[in-house]
């Protein structure tokens, strides 16, 4: 069995930046253990699998796997999946994906790239001393939590975000959490870094789902709904951000870097 495969850098303007994702269209779902084995073989932060949506609720069903596990939401691999579908049909301007735990997601073509609509995840203030300690943050300005397993830790400035040197083993022992460190930025309205060692991703390069948590917080801080963001990983990536009620809209571009087939014996 041969499966079409593309590796796409999302939230990127050139190769080797943004966040790489595998995109693999299927005619029907393979067994869960096969999907996980493929994602492990790809060894990318995420591999996105899609099949035509027989329910008619959306164009495709969409699932995401890291090398370690299936996840409930992945923004950058959804943007990459939209790029894959819309790039194959220049007459098409929008594609919808039905997900198992995050509702229906939309990717639309814009004049400069793509717009991805995700649910807005409103985090609430909560003491997170173990997570802050694992991140080597002695005195965070604020700590917030969303029950999807996302921690948002606010620090004083962009330099502090860039200087973070986490204890990844300590973070791993805390379980399936996504740890976001964020601050007001100089290169953008706000900057972030994201650490997810439980999912075999020590530091995620550019994380769409993390912005579903960060955007509502920063919209309240800035008193406006439209912002710019930069994820200050080694690869780095710019994200346009807008809070739209119970949703967030992320804008960015994608670059296809590999196309081929994945062979299953």
Model-derived regions, located:
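Active-site proximal loop and beta-alpha junction motif in alpha/beta enzyme cores
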Residues: 1-73, 79-265
């Amino acid at each position: 069995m041969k499966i079409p495969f593309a590796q796409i850098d999302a939230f990127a303007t050139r190769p080797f930046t943004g966040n790489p994702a595998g995109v693999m269209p299927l005619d029907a779902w393979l067994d869960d253990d096969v999907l996980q084995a493929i994602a492990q073989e790809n060894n990318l932060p995420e591999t996105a699998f899609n099949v035509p949506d027989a329910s008619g609720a959306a164009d495709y069903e969409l699932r995401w796997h890291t090398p370690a596990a299936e996840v409930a939401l992945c923004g950058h691999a959804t943007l990459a999946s939209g790029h894959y579908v819309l790039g194959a049909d220049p007459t098409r301007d929008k594609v919808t994906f039905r997900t198992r735990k995050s509702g229906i997601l939309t990717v639309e073509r814009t004049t400069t790239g793509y717009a991805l609509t995700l649910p807005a995840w409103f985090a609430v203030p909560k003491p997170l001393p173990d997570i802050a300690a694992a991140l080597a943050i002695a005195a965070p300005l604020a700590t917030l939590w969303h029950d999807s397993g996302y921690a948002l830790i606010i620090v004083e400035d962009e330099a502090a975000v860039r200087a973070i040197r986490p204890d990844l083993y300590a973070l791993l022992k805390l379980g399936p959490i996504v740890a976001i460190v964020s601050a007001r930025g100089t290169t953008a309205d706000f900057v972030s870094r994201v650490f997810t060692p439980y999912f075999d991703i020590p530091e995620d390069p550019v994380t769409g789902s993390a912005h579903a948590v960060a955007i509502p917080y920063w919209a309240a801080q800035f008193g406006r709904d439209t912002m710019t963001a930069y994820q200050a990983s080694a690869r780095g990536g710019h994200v346009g951000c807008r809070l739209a009620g119970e949703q967030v809209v992320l804008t960015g571009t994608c670059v296809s870097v590999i196309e081929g087939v994945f062979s299953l014996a």
